Regions:
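Conserved PDZ fold ligand-binding element
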Residues: 1-20
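Terminal peptide-recognition signature
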Residues: 11-13, 36, 80
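Short conserved beta-strand and strand-loop elements enriched in small hydrophobics
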Residues: 32-40
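Conserved Radical SAM active-site core
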Residues: 42-48, 52-198, 208-217
Length: 217
């Protein structure tokens, strides 16, 4: 226990790599031989060498699971189920997450609209796979209209980069009658199939509508 990190300290540096969040931690601690650089409360740094089974967790616990805040959604989708929630529910149900880390770790779906170039490259470099993508349409203009985000059309190009890097993707399409069904859906299915085998699955689900839609699309 005395050799471990001090409670409340920063994440350890692993094999020369700084750890920014849980993805870095899981990726860099997978190896059986690790050199951890720990920072003491007085600011001194020391190195601890660890031997373990490949993939075995070190058992460190962090203040939050992601080691920072979950990234929130930057879209205003015309079919958003969170916007149709009844009032008076617990606060966490109204949080719209759109975080690549939660996609990989928890199976959440993301739209790719708030990923920076650096984050795209990080997903490829760390082999973060599979990820679940809310696609809805591969038509860039229509996707911008549906997600109400001017960056939404860039998502398909990002998916093609992931496909070229062999990042596995599970895709979801929320089918909205008269908007992204019919010929638009045919195009989406055709273009997603063209990214196989990286596109592992495609699910088409009907849009859900509740009575709490005042002021919505």
């Amino acid at each position: 226990p005395a050799a471990g990190p001090a409670p409340g300290g920063p994440p350890p540096e692993v094999n020369g790599h700084p750890v920014a969040d849980v993805l870095d931690y899981k990726f860099y601690t997978y190896d059986p031989k690790l050199a951890l650089v720990l920072q003491e409360p007085n600011g001194n740094r020391r190195t601890v060498r660890v031997r373990k089974e490949e993939g075995e967790d070190l058992g460190l616990e962090f203040e939050t699971y992601l080691m920072d805040r979950a990234r929130s959604c930057a879209n205003n989708c015309i079919f958003c189920f969170v916007d149709q929630m009844p009032p008076g529910m617990r606060k966490s149900l109204y949080f719209k997450d759109d975080d690549a880390r939660l996609s990989f770790l928890m199976g959440n779906y993301l739209t790719l609209t708030n990923l920076s170039q650096r984050e795209v490259e990080r997903i490829i470099a760390l082999r973060i796979s599979p990820i679940n993508v809310s696609v809805h349409t591969t038509d860039p203009e229509l996707r911008c209209e549906m997600l109400k985000n001017r960056r939404a059309g860039e998502g398909i190009a990002i998916m093609r980069r992931f496909a070229q890097a062999s990042i596995t993707m599970n895709c979801q399409i929320v089918s909205c009658p008269g908007i992204n069904d019919g010929p638009a859906l045919d195009r989406t299915l055709r273009e997603l199939a063209g990214m196989a085998p990286a596109v592992n699955s495609i699910s088409v689900v009907p849009v859900g509508v509740t009575k709490y839609r005042e002021g919505l699309y």
